[in-house]
Structure formats: C-alpha cells, structure tokens
C-alpha cells in the first residue's frame, strides 16, 4: 500500500504541530515570557524606531524601557489602590452575607430543607488564605516581569538586524517573501493590540461610570476588572459582568442589580460586537468559537498567561498562514469568512 505525497505531507505537518505544542508546554518557563516579550516588542518597535532617528540608540532603548516600567508602575498602583478600597469593606460584606445566610437558613428550616450554616469567621480565614496566595502570585509575577524585560531588551537590540540575517540565510526570493510576511503580520498585529487596548480602556471607563451612577460599591475596582478581563475576548466580557452585578444584587437590592446587569451587558455588547469589529476590520476577527478554543488551548499550554495570549497568538498564526499559499487554507479555517 502506497501513501501519496499529499498524505505524507499532511501527516508530517500534524506530527510537527504536535511536537511544537509539546515543546511549548515543556518549555513554558521560557517560551511564554518570550511570547510576551515578542508582543511587547511589536507594540513598541515603531516608537523605538522614531526615537532612534532623533537620539542615540542606547538612549532610545532606555526611554522605551522607562515608558514600559512606568506603565507597569501605574498598573501596580491601580491594583494597590483597589486593594486599599476593598480591605475596609470586607468585614461589612461578611456581616451582610452572615445575615443573609441566617435568613436563608431560617427559611430553609421552616420547610425542612437541609442547608449548611455560614460562618463569617470562616469567610475571613478564606480571604486571608487568598491574600497569602495573592502575595505569592505577585512575587512570581515580579520575577516573570524581570525575565520578560530582559528578553525584550535583547529583542529590541536585535530587531534592526533581522532583515539582513534573513537575506543571508535564504535565497533572495524567499527572503523577500519572509521579510514582507513578517512586516505585514507585525503591522496588523500591532493594530489589533492597540485597538484591543483602546476598547478595553473604554469598557473599563464605562463600567466604572455605570456602577458609580447606580451606587454600586467598588465602582473603580469593577472598571479595572473589566479593563483587564476584556483582553480575553468573549469569556472575559461575560466574567467581567458577574461580580458587580452580584454586589449590586446583594447589597443594593434586586432593581439595582437588574439595572447594573442590563447596563453592563449593553456596554459589553456594543463595544464587543460593533465598535471593536469596526475598528479592527473583519480580517482580524475570530469567530466566538475559535476565540474560546484559542483561550482554552493556550491556557492548557501556558496556564493563565496563555489564556491572556491565546487570541493574539491565534491571530498571529492566521496572519502568517495567510501570507503563504501552502498554509492559506489554515488561515481561512481559523479566521472569519471574507465577503
């Protein structure tokens, strides 16, 4: 029995894909930070190039790094402020939950329905354990950030030399195609990340404003949560609506809870289904199914950071596959249908 050349190539491609995924999972401690560094480099490279035309290269690199560190400082400051806002509210929330638990327990006992007793002290202990876990996570994130910055510096130092290296490594026709494909992919990916950041900012601002209008506690925190979670398309938008809705429902009553839910759902729907696609263009859109599979798959490969990078990674693969005839079918299967 003979196997055709096409079948052999297909089998080889499948085997190679499996091996690459296994390698990425086995080397997650270095491959995941490298992916983060790559996406950051794609974002900041135009700024670095602009600065290099006016300043020495070493100074432009320092300014770009200072800008990134400043951005991270703002993010850490926002998280710290959120923690300071939440901390004094915890006892009040636990007391309220204790009262609701007792009311529910009394109602259930009258109807002979077994229900476990809620203890506020147990809640405090759980919050403390979560806080300790959060501190460990922050320490891990700090070491990860240092590694990402180190890789980013090396990437930015080498980025201006990659075209010459490609020309020396491949024949002129192939090297031109590779350089054009990488440049086009980087430009489109940069647009995607910038538009995504813009829509996340708008979502966070509108979420915080809506919660503030309806008197929902921790409005700033819910805006920050919405900003972060909307980097995870589809799934993040759904999760971002749940916490403020529950807080409004429990502490402000059913009418405000429903108003909060409806308002936040409208914000997510308009920005996710109308504003973002109009800014991105259809060629950079994923179907909700592919987006969800991307999040789950890359989350399995790299954990939570992989879930955050899932959609950008998939879009990068689609853009690169679209540039070559042999892989264009993969791009069509993963992307939206073009009119």
Model regions: which residues?
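Anchoring transmembrane alpha helix of integral membrane proteins
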Residues: 1-80, 152, 314, 319-339
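Hydrophobic transmembrane alpha-helices
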Residues: 20, 37-41, 68-71, 152-155, ...
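Membrane-water interface of transmembrane alpha-helices in multipass transporters/channels
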Residues: 29-36, 213-225, 252-260, 286-291, ...
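Hydrophobic alpha-helical transmembrane segments of membrane transport and translocation systems
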Residues: 257-339
């Amino acid at each position: 029995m003979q196997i055709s050349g096409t079948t052999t190539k297909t089998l080889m491609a499948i085997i190679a894909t499996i091996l690459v995924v296994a390698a990425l999972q086995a080397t997650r401690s270095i491959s995941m930070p490298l992916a983060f560094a790559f996406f950051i480099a794609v974002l900041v490279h135009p700024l670095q190039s602009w600065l290099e035309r006016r300043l020495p290269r070493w100074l432009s690199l320092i300014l770009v790094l200072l800008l990134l560190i400043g951005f991270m400082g703002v993010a850490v400051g926002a998280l710290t402020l959120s923690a300071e806002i939440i901390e004094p509210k915890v006892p009040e929330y636990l007391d309220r939950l204790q009262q609701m638990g007792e009311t529910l327990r009394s109602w259930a006992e009258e109807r002979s329905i077994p229900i476990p007793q809620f203890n506020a002290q147990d809640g405090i202990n759980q919050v403390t354990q979560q806080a300790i876990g959060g501190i460990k996570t922050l320490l891990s994130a700090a070491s990860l950030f240092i590694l990402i910055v180190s890789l980013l510096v090396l990437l930015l130092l080498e980025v201006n030399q990659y075209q010459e290296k490609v020309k020396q490594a491949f024949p002129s026709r192939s090297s031109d195609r590779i350089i054009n494909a990488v440049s086009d992919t980087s430009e489109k990916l940069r647009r995607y990340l910038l538009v995504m950041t813009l829509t996340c900012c708008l979502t966070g601002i509108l979420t915080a404003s809506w919660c503030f209008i309806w008197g929902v506690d921790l409005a700033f925190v819910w805006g920050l949560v919405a900003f972060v979670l909307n980097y995870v398309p589809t799934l993040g938008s759904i999760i971002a609506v749940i916490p403020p809705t529950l807080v409004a429902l429990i502490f402000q009553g059913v009418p405000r809870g429903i108003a909060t839910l409806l308002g936040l759902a409208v914000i997510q729907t308009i920005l996710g289904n109308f504003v973002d696609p109009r800014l991105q263009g259809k060629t950079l859109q994923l179907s909700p199914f592919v987006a969800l599979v991307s999040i789950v798959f890359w989350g399995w490969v790299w954990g939570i950071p992989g879930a955050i990078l899932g959609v950008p990674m998939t879009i990068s693969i689609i853009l690169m596959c679209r540039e070559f005839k042999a892989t264009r079918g993969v791009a069509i299967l993963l992307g939206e249908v073009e009119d």
